[in-house]
Amino acid sequence: MALLYAGTMAADALKVVADRPEGKGSGPLQPRASAPKSGTTLDTFGAGEPMNDKQRIVCQHCDGLVGVPAERLGDGPRCPKCHTPLFDGHPVELNSSNFDQHVARSDVPVVVDFWAPWCAPCRMMAPAFAEVASRMEPAARFAKLNTDESQQVAARYGIRSIPTLIVFKGGREVARQPGAMASAQLMRWVSDALSRS
């Protein structure tokens, strides 16, 4: 089940829950040794393990698959494996080796900026993309893929001009937009793409 920015799950995804798991005070969410109550802990999952009512999110630092209850997404969850924030308000750097892991395995929609360092419009749009990422996470994961370094991925998605933005939900492309955008325009486009699909 994908998390929508403009839908009924948006409130759950964006609200900040004041209480923390038992015995954890105001610190980061971490698994407990005792049997947890539903929706109170984060878990790492291997292939084929059930996620139940949790949103699958790939850690931007260790690429581990983490299960987070939907109502806890806005709580600043941390990866139980590497203990870093799952969302830090900055786009994730993707490459050929981690692209499929982040795009195909995440229940949270992923907005990918296909760019190159020599591209002036790409460099001009980078601050707007980072600003929108900081404002819209955790409703969507924002990521960047350098097409010079990951030519196979760019070719697989038929990237012919850069920057090109693609929104993925459940591993499939749901929206595409070539060309640079200002932050307000980019935020509208991402919100519309997430609410349509």
Show the residue positions of the predicted features.
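A short beta-strand-turn-helix
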Residues: 92-109
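Short, intrinsically disordered low-complexity segments enriched in Ser/Thr with adjacent Pro
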Residues: 4, 26-28, 34-38
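Short linker/helix segments within small regulatory modules
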Residues: 68-77
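Short pre-active-site segment immediately N-terminal to redox-active cysteine/selenocysteine motifs
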Residues: 107, 114-118, 161
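Typically the conserved alpha-helix immediately C-terminal to a functionally engaged Cys/Sec
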Residues: 121-136
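Non-catalytic, surface beta->alpha helical segment in thiol-disulfide oxidoreductase systems
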Residues: 161, 167-197
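Short cysteine-rich clusters marking metal-coordination/redox-active sites
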Residues: 59-62, 79-82
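Cys/His-rich microdomains that often coordinate metals
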Residues: 66, 86, 126
